[in-house]
Amino acid sequence: IYVQQSTNPLPLLIADLKKEVINQILKQEEIEEIKSMLYAPGYITHADLPAIYNGAKAFLYTSLRESFGIPLLESMSCGTPVITSNTSAIPEIAGDGAILVDPLDVNAIASQLLKLETNELYRKQQITYGLERTKLFSWQHTAEQLLKVYQSITKK
């Protein structure tokens, strides 16, 4: 849907899946025409992730089940807008720092990708929201919150 609606569709990097698996999925879903837009490097090391996040126009993370979602925070902290699921623990972690969508609604996902692609002001706002959100998960903030808990316990 996104590829059909976009005048200049963004390429898609798919991490941790082999190209053969992706090709099989494309064939099964009868969408092989988008194969040239996909890049599947396989496993990506942690050392390479910041460069990939920084080079991305958006980070799409539509997991159906997630207990925390560290990649969301990694991407946001690199200044990459995030489109993610409105399910499981993701909304609690993402807060207003990411665009929440139904992970099964391809129209909603495509719509948000198009909006990020075509509306630079919206994209910059999402970057700002994401950077602000990550401050809540910094080591500094976590240590301050833990100190407050300890102080409240010792005062009792």
Pin down the residues of each PLM region.
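Short hydrophobic beta-strand element within catalytic cores of glycosyltransferases
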Residues: 72, 77, 81-84
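A short, well-ordered alpha-helix in the C-terminal region of glycosyltransferases
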Residues: 108, 122-136, 145-148, 152
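Conserved acidic donor-binding segment of nucleotide-sugar-dependent glycosyltransferases
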Residues: 99-106, 115-120
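Short acidic/histidine- and often glycine-rich active-site loop of Leloir-type glycosyltransferases
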Residues: 72, 87-100
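Short hydrophobic signal-anchor/transmembrane segments that target glycosyltransferases
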Residues: 1-9, 28-32
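Nucleotide-activated donor-binding/catalytic signature segment of Leloir-type glycosyltransferases, i.e.
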Residues: 14-16, 24-50
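Aromatic "clamp/platform" in nucleotide-sugar-dependent glycosyltransferases that forms part
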Residues: 64
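Short alpha-helical donor nucleotide-sugar binding micro-motif in glycosyltransferases
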Residues: 44, 51-56, 61, 109
